Amino acid sequence: LAKRLAEYGGCYVVLIHPNVTKEKIEFLNAVVPELKRFAWFGTLQQFGDWWTMRDGVSVDARIFEDEMVITVDSELPIQGLRLDLDTDWIPQSPLPDGVSFSPGSVYIAAAGTELSITMNMPEMDR
């Protein structure tokens, strides 16, 4: 289940109560090394911060002839946000500081609360 959820960025929560510790510790000792290969581990505070940021982000994409302008608006400064894109789309101009591109995605490591990126679109996508 955790692998299937990871494929689309889902959340896998393990909640353990301390009433029967031996079996639960054994479970954690077995599952954590397997999950670490592809999962992020965080505290409840980190998860809450992530959820608050996720809930406050909106993305708008507008097509103008041979380009697409992607605008990201956020209630909080944007940190650690990945946008999955068509692998043929390429940024038209240099990206702002804190933003990186690889085919199929734009990663926003750190930005303010609004960011626009102009992408070249192949003719077949228009």
Predicted regions and their residues:
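Short C-terminal domain-edge/linker segments immediately following a structured domain
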Residues: 43-48, 99-103
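Catalytic grooves of carbohydrate-active enzymes
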Residues: 1-47
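A residue-identity detector for tryptophan
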Residues: 40, 50-51, 89
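A structural signal for short secondary-structure junctions
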Residues: 4-8, 34, 51-52, 62-66, ...
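C-terminal beta-sandwich/jelly-roll accessory domains of carbohydrate-active enzymes
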Residues: 56-126
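Proline/serine/threonine-rich low-complexity linkers at boundaries of modular beta-sandwich domains
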Residues: 47-56
